Amino acid sequence: MRRLTALLAAGLVVSVVAASCGRAEARREPADSPRAASSSDATTSPQADRRLSSPLPEPDAWIPRAPDRLAPALDATTRSLRSAIDRWTTEGDVSSGEAPLDVQLLALYQQRIYRMLARDPALADDVVARLSSSVAKEARINVAAGSNLLSLASPVSRPSLIRTQPPEPPGVLLGFYREAEDRFGVAWQVLAAVNYTESKFGRVVSASSAGAQGPMQFIPSTWAAYGLGGDVHDPHDAILGAANYLHASGAPGNYRVALYHYNPVPAYVDAVMRYARQMTRDPRTFYAYYNWQVFVLTKHGELRLTGPGL
């Protein structure tokens, strides 16, 4: 039995959803497996513009609500973020320290836009219809995944009790995902999507109300069965344990069945699959999601707990 915290992906909210999980075997490759997605959809930019087209947004920069202004803002932010990620991954060190400031600020602004769109389906439809084709497909995925998880949201009564910490560098985490993929056959994008959804890549340290612990949110009994003798709080051990559990539950043959055993909530499964599919389409999205921050929903509104300016 295991259950996950509900750190809602797309930085929407933190909520706790208790669930009981078991084991099942699956025998078919799902059509929506992340491995089935083509990376040809991703827009690459080997000659990416080295200069941002506009000043970097402040951490709490105003977001326009009019679709004819919000769509260009999301389009420009996404393109600038892709270029900043290209520079970081080719000229910087993704295995040491934190992301460059431009990546952090652009990712946060993008995340805040998607939070707004996930709460307003009509606005989202209008904005996405105005986006360039290379951004629109990514936007549809992010809005849908965010909406999935928003449906599970519940307010946190005491956000001050939620403990956070800096995550491992993305290059280090990617190495852990690939090691787990090589050992258990679970796509690294699925592991990254679970890690993101459960704890924002390890930013959230607190256990869930159901007692789930660590960056992949295991309850003790499930960890004892699938944790391979490791430390549930260690990112490397937790990622391998998650891959072991997903493999035992049907992955890679049927990711949906495996994820449903991980957390038997259809909206959760849909969200994880969507984020994984987007990272398969464009691996740069992993670095964007990595820089999306922790938000919690309170009775007074949403509150950001991590990231620039705090």
Where on the chain are the PLM-derived regions?
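Cell-wall glycan-active module
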Residues: M1-E179, P266, R274-L310
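Alpha-helical segment that forms one wall of the substrate-binding/catalytic cleft
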Residues: E168-R183, Q189, G202, P215, ...
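Short, conserved phosphate-binding/catalytic loop or strand-edge motifs used
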Residues: T197, A212, I219
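Glycine- and aromatic-rich loop/turn segments at beta-sheet edges
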Residues: V205-G211
